[in-house]
């Protein structure tokens, strides 16, 4: 994590790690995986509120870019879900962009009896929206709302997020919780073929951008 090692005298927590890396680790490692450094509402950074910003406590984009000039940097793309307290969800409720149709809702006919997931909270949250009753999908927590990849705009948004990270020096990516990306009624909703097609697309984009 960007704030795992820091010096309280420094303004940005990530600088403390970078100093520690230079003194203790650089002769042994040339790749660093920074877990989510975005503004987040829960789950140690995995409930992202804004994919285009860095948590102001952790640092700035320039901290990542400068570190990446001499080291390989790996970052997470938190692709399956987004924060219930972020701009996207606020816009979703208002039918405004960015956020309109970004989150997955299902109706009462959806068969979720076979769903496999690593949590035991209530999966679906009833919501009255757009003059009808729908159910928000929440694989990991009530604060982490699953995104709707049946909306091409969501996929395009994450391609842009990847490109933004590349522009700041990131060369290796981890697609967080990617196995849960696609949902179909009556299935386990994990590792579905549609998910693998999206992974192939990201692999193709990585090859084009010369990143991993």
Model feature map: region roles:
Residues 1-159, 167, 178-212:
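Acidic/aromatic-lined carbohydrate-recognition and catalytic surfaces
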